[in-house]
């Protein structure tokens, strides 16, 4: 059951009213007699492998290009793949993107590692909108309300603003559509008392109104002792065709998630050096406070107005609002003593994040001629105000030691030095005005030139609510004016194969993220600069039964913050990090019943110039590999239909070893995860699926939290689900 306090209910009231008005207005606008609609037939589809290259992606370009036409590594994980691969969360969807690894560790639950970069260097968008707090705001969300997930590798600041050196990811919600009446229901149950109930419906009301509502509830007892999770998502939208050329979509979303006694990690056996070791007896242990908690409430609202002025000119205006409230109450750090006979608990954190974003984006698309050459333009202006206040209370501890296997932990507020008080630390206000422009001109029938440019003016204002000193002034402000872009060419070797080359740039903060930045992190530094060269090819073959992509890239990020060798207490914007790699994707329908798909990436990432303070000494880490970045990541999916209505399949994921520290002295081992499923279709619209994940019950680190802890991945799970549509 969803528990909402009176205070939270008051905060939610605008959302409730918006949802009610959405459907009541739609109903009011409908005539009394609803016209007959064409019958919607839901059946199993077999699309060609080449279709993956014909999907359009607005994340990689605003020009309306297909994956094949875009001069970059672009991945589109659509609704069909989400269901076929048993993708339960937004983060699981990223396994379908070559090279990406993720972590949902509570301290950074939206962590994504892409092309050797992480944090603010990988932008995560929600319907094309960035909240500039991705490592926290992009916490995994249940996939039911999403239509697809898109990703573009490499610098892409020119599309969506500061960040995106390693790439950009876009989570796109289901919206009301004109494709007919459809209702979908799903129920599932699995290990650790995991349950899901979900429903969605798309309805035409009258001649010009279309409504959609999706609701999902997911709950489970976590595999770690004492952990319980309950999450709700609601997405509603109303599409209104005001005229044949003008339409408006109102879309709202509500998300609430509560995790009791979150799992923060497992201590590493000492001595810690070389490859890490996990005591299997502690795999399921939870050393957090007995009443530890994480809770978040998120609301989105978007108003999208689209106008087709002519066959050549289209306009689109998006007004958007986002607000989120997140609460943490946890003991977050655990370490074995020297003899591995006791675990010391420390680092108690009472934290609140209160964030709100408001903005408006006006865009245009124009298709025309430049002399005798076909040309396409897209551009616009985006203005937003992003405000966040954080309320941290941190008590280092330690809070005593416990037996690693048989223990109880005290309530959070019984710990010495902890109080139930939320005191603001600082408020960051980020005002952004951006102009952006893209063009694609076909120089010949085979050769096209693509360019993109973006200019941002970013005003950062930080108000300190606590003690003032030289490193923490009462107020400071900074202004940044990055200019970023992309220039690329594509050449069609044949109607089914092309090659491309591109150069792109990016900009992001030298350390941290601007929505939480402190004076010591930004000082008088400018944004870092990133640049990439990429060459690649996209092709289909065997009459569309097979398709593939290959890409080679080289990325350099300059002016990152590093420790000053002459003064270990300060930083200088002189560091540099680089990565170069290869990414491969492929899919092939071997027979009408058998299909294989996969991706593989190799990355060589390193610090080129990087200093780290070790006590009072400054040590160079130049040449070392960034933490939590594997050199190799691969995925393989195999699906076979042995008889009518039946389907079986398996998948394997490989991740090579990673380092836990920038000194590269501690690492985990590589790991392989195996999964399998069997499904049976009852009639044309109902599907029953049994699925297993991590079938070998591999103990592996999803994330390495320094040299004392590892955040372990989920053990073996099984689940059974039924989904129907009518």
Q: Could you describe each region identified by the protein language model?
A:
Residues 446, 545, 554-556, 573-662, ...:
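Gram-negative outer-membrane beta-barrel transporters
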Residues 144-147, 153, 158-236, 242-246, ...:
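Outer-membrane beta-barrel translocator/receptor signature
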Residues 306-320, 324-332, 492, 498-500, ...:
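Membrane-embedded beta-barrel scaffold of Gram-negative outer-membrane proteins
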Residues 218-222, 235-241, 245-308, 321-355, ...:
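Acidic/polar loop-and-plug regions of large Gram-negative outer-membrane beta-barrel proteins
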Residues 18, 353, 377, 624-726:
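Conserved C-terminal beta-signal and adjacent last beta-strands/turns
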Residues 102, 113, 129-153, 176:
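Short acidic/polar hinge/loop motifs at secondary-structure boundaries
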Residues 241-243, 355, 373-378, 382-386, ...:
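Structural signature of Gram-negative outer-membrane beta-barrels, strongest in the C-terminal barrel
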Residues 299-323, 346-464, 549:
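Face-selective signature of the C-terminal outer-membrane beta-barrel domain
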